[in-house]
């Protein structure tokens, strides 16, 4: 599994082609491509070489100086919360569950956004799960278990303050997950989210 960001200052089609080429080469193996050394069993395929420009992501283009003008903010917030409240009630009546995932830099406003969202919701119909370092109980199981156990029942919602994406973000960067573990996590995360969607859960990230 590989990710190709299509909102970056390089040709996403070219990057997708390079990524596919690397994946095909890694799966064909040494027989079809004798000029390439076979990768050790169980090791992830090396990422394709990228230029400095190609390595840029959408986060490199974020304008950290942008601010929302205070004029009309409260009115717009109240209107949005009212609409959200109506949608939440309708989802509860129709037994539609929802999972909302918040990821972002530290102090980027995740907690504030969650508070503004839950202010419009019946507290009996949702849970907020703050994801921190795993406990000993969680370490003894697959890393997705700590999220599976909070998947909401029909008509209810779960908001995750940080999520399973930590496996390929902080755990990868800080060295808490081995390369084979975080490489495998891309497919595991996709499968997990597909199972949620197949069950009729509304997933917002």
Language-model segments: which ranges?
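Glycine-rich phosphate-binding loop of ATP-dependent small-molecule kinases
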Residues: 1-205
């Amino acid at each position: 599994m590989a990710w190709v960001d299509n909102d970056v200052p390089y040709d996403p089609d070219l990057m997708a082609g390079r990524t596919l080429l690397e994946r095909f080469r890694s799966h064909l193996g040494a027989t079809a491509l004798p000029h390439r050394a076979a990768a050790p069993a169980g090791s992830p395929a090396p990422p394709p070489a990228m230029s400095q420009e190609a390595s840029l992501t959408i986060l490199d283009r974020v304008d950290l100086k942008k601010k929302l003008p205070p004029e009309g903010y409260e009115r717009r917030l109240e209107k949005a919360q009212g609409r959200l409240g109506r949608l939440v009630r309708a989802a509860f009546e129709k037994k539609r569950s929802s999972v909302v995932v918040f990821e972002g830099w530290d102090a980027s406003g995740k907690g504030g956004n969650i508070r503004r969202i839950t202010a419009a919701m019946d507290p009996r119909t949702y849970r907020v799960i703050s994801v921190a370092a795993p406990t000993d109980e969680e370490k003894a199981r697959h890393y997705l278990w700590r999220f599976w156990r909070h998947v909401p029942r029909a008509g209810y919602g779960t908001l995750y303050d940080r999520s399973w994406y930590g496996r390929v973000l902080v755990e990868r960067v800080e060295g808490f997950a081995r390369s084979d573990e975080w490489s495998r996590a891309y497919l595991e995360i996709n499968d997990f989210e597909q199972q949620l969607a197949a069950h009729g859960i509304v997933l917002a990230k």
